[in-house]
Amino acid sequence: MGAFTDKQEALVSSSFEAFKTNIPQYSVVFYTSILEKAPVAKDLFSFLANGVDPTNPKLTGHAEKLFGLVRDSAGQLKASGTVVIDAALGSIHAQKAITDPQFVVVKEALLKTIKEAVGDKWSDELSSAWEVAYDELAAAIKKAF
């Protein structure tokens, strides 16, 4: 991977801010997209036991944390070219036996959600910045398994 640029980091950060303008709505978009592609994912998230409920603080909190981790990964990539995570994050994903296809489903849902959040500001460049940041975060999580 080439160096993560200031522009890429700025694209991720600004679109994260757009996501934060309506976390309940975008959390619904995100988790609904995941469940449409992988209904069994419902069993991986205790807060989805009763479906996608935008008033559930665990649902919105988890979405905000995940999107924030990708944003933080963009910052790390710009600063040092690598993503470092807390080992506990790797442990949680290992315990749940998360597979590569599941990481892909989450990435697709994340991109769909950011696309909705930014509206007409969506671009291939913005998509690519989020993809790189997410892929590097996912690689760091898998490495910590």
Curated annotation (Swiss-Prot):
Post-translational modification: Nitrated mainly at Tyr-31 and, to a lower extent, at Tyr-26 and Tyr-134, in effective nodules and particularly in hypoxic conditions; this mechanism may play a protective role in the symbiosis by buffering toxic peroxynitrite NO(2)(-). Nitration level decrease during nodule senescence. Phosphorylation at Ser-46 disrupts the molecular environment of its porphyrin ring oxygen binding pocket, thus leading to a reduced oxygen consumption and to the delivery of oxygen O(2) to symbiosomes.
Distribution of this protein across tissues and organs: Specifically expressed in root nodules, and barely in pods.
A GO term, aspect molecular function: metal ion binding
PROSITE patterns: GLOBIN (PS01033), PLANT_GLOBIN (PS00208)
Residue numbers carrying N-acetylglycine: 2
Factors inducing expression: Negatively regulated by cobalt (Co) in a dose-dependent manner. Suppressed by exposure to excess nitrogen (N); this repression is associated with nodule greening and reduced biological nitrogen fixation (BN) efficiency.
Domain Globin intervals: 3-145
PTM-bearing positions, type Phosphoserine: 46
Positions that bind O2: 62
Gene Ontology CC terms: cytosol; nucleus
Keyword list, A-Z: Acetylation, Cytoplasm, Heme, Iron, Metal-binding, Nitration, Nitrogen fixation, Nodulation, Nucleus, Oxygen transport, Phosphoprotein, Transport
Location (main, coarse): cytoplasm
Record PTM Nitrated tyrosine, positions in chain: 26, 31, 134
Signal peptide segment: none
Disulfide bridges in this chain: none
Alphabetical GO biological process terms: nodulation; response to cobalt ion; response to nitrogen compound
Localization of this protein: Cytoplasm, Cytosol; Nucleus
Amino-acid positions noted as binding heme b in the UniProt annotation, renumbered to this chain: 46, 65, 93, 96
Record family assignment: Belongs to the plant globin family.
Function text: Leghemoglobin that reversibly binds oxygen O(2) through a pentacoordinated heme iron. In root nodules, facilitates the diffusion of oxygen to the bacteroids while preventing the bacterial nitrogenase from being inactivated by buffering dioxygen, nitric oxide and carbon monoxide, and promoting the formation of reactive oxygen species (ROS, e.g. H(2)O(2)). This role is essential for symbiotic nitrogen fixation (SNF).
Assembly: Monomer.
Name of the protein described by the UniProt record: Leghemoglobin 1
Organism: Glycine max
